[in-house]
Each structure stands twice: as C-alpha cells, then as structure tokens.
Design a protein with these regions (language model features):
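Conserved HGGG/HGGXW glycine-rich cap/lid loop of the alpha/beta-hydrolase fold
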Residues: 1-36
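Conserved acidic catalytic loop of the alpha/beta-hydrolase fold
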Residues: 47-65
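Flexible "cap/lid" loop of the alpha/beta hydrolase fold
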Residues: 75-83, 89-118
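Hydrophobic, aromatic-rich cap/lid helix
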Residues: 122-147, 163
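Short beta-strand/loop motif that positions the catalytic acidic residue
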Residues: 152, 158-160
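Conserved alpha/beta-hydrolase "acid-adjacent" motif
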Residues: 165-170
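Catalytic histidine neighborhood in serine/cysteine hydrolases
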Residues: 175-191
Length: 211
C-alpha cells in the first residue's frame, strides 16, 4: 500500500510515513517543482499534479494504491480519485478543500494579498514567479464541485483539526458528498498529522484495518 504526501514536507515524513513504513510499502513523491522533482514546463495546477501522479504510478508499475494526501496533497488525491477510480484502493484526505472559499478568511486574505504582490513582480524576479505559482495553488485551485465527489468510489477517510484553517462545515461537505466516506475531527490545527501524530495515526490505522 502506498501513500501520497503533500507538497508541505515538514513533519510529514517523520510522523506519518515513518509510522506506516514498517507495515506498508510507502512511496512519498514530491510534486513537480518541489524537493527533487523538476518543475518542467506544464501548468502548475492541481489538475497537472494529478496527471503527474498518474504518470508516476504507471511508470513505476503501481496498478492501485491507498492514497494519503495532506492539504494540497488531499486536493490532488481527490482529483486523481475522481479521474482514475480504478487505481485507488482507499483515500485519506487530510486538510483538503474544494475551492478557496473553504479556507477561513483570516488565513485566505493574506494569501491572496501575497499572491497579487508576487504576481506583480513575477516577470522581473524568478523568486517572485515561484512564489506566485505556489500561492496561486491556494487562490485558483482546486475548484472541485461538491457533486463531482460522487465520482470517488473508494472508501475514504476525511480528517481535519478542530482549529483547522479549512472551515469545518466545508470539510463536512467533502465527507458528506463522497459516497463511502467517514469523518474524523482531531483536536488541533491544520497540522494535526504532525502535532497530534498519535491521534492522527490511530485514526488512519483504524481506517486501514477496516478495509
């Protein structure tokens, strides 16, 4: 069984990947432009990252996998599971969102301001262009309609924190619109996988054991 991690690596490998690697075959690829993965020339979007995951699994002869995604990784996982349901054994979505409105305004507003500033200087600065691409993911993506989630056929665990940057009603909407989904809310913020690793891993273990 294999997992997909988010584009935010801090703590995730240490607290989640390490926990599962003794019982499962865990693969944690970096999305394009992150870690050791080249940026390439394709669009820097959640849809493209989903296509990249498809290519990655095909190239590594992985016919089917349990996919775990955090934040943008959860958004990639949703897109992937909708388009390639036959390649998903189960889905674990931690801190994902359907659109920018799912993010609490207190968090989203600084992101939007930063995006506008970075975009303004993008043509004159490689660093600003990189920041514009990163922030653009949180401003312009993933744009998933709730009804589209019905295309996800795999058993799904949706996880969030009680003080998550994603609105709780938005997370509940995700769980309610995926046919075979269960919801787990853990005390903590957006980074419960790191800060509340025991509770997080316990929920994931319970879910995987039920498959």
């Amino acid at each position: 069984k294999r997992g997909l991690r988010s584009r935010k690596p801090i703590g995730f490998r240490q607290w989640v990947v390490h926990h599962f690697c003794d019982r499962y075959r865990v693969i944690a690829p970096d999305t394009r432009g992150h870690g050791k993965s080249p940026r390439g020339t394709s669009p820097f979007t959640i849809r493209q990252f989903s296509c990249d995951l498809y290519d990655f699994m095909k190239n590594h002869r992985i016919p089917k996998a349990v996919i775990l995604g955090f934040s943008d990784g959860a958004n990639i996982a949703m897109r992937f599971a909708m388009k390639h349901p036959d390649m998903v054994t189960a889905l674990i979505l931690n801190g994902g969102n359907l659109d920018a409105k799912g993010v609490k305004r207190s968090t989203q507003l600084p992101i939007e301001i930063g995006y506008k500033i970075a975009k303004h200087f993008a043509k004159r600065s490689a660093e600003a262009n990189k920041n514009a691409e990163l922030l653009g993911l949180m401003v312009n993506d993933p744009n998933i309609e709730p009804e589209e989630l019905a295309q996800i056929t795999a058993p799904t665990l949706v996880i969030c924190g009680t003080k998550d940057m994603i609105r709780e009603d938005h997370t509940r909407k995700i769980a309610e619109n995926i046919p075979n989904a269960r919801l787990a809310i853990i005390e903590g913020d957006h980074f419960v996988a790191n800060k509340r690793s025991e509770e997080f891993n316990r929920e994931v273990d319970r879910f995987l054991e039920s498959l």
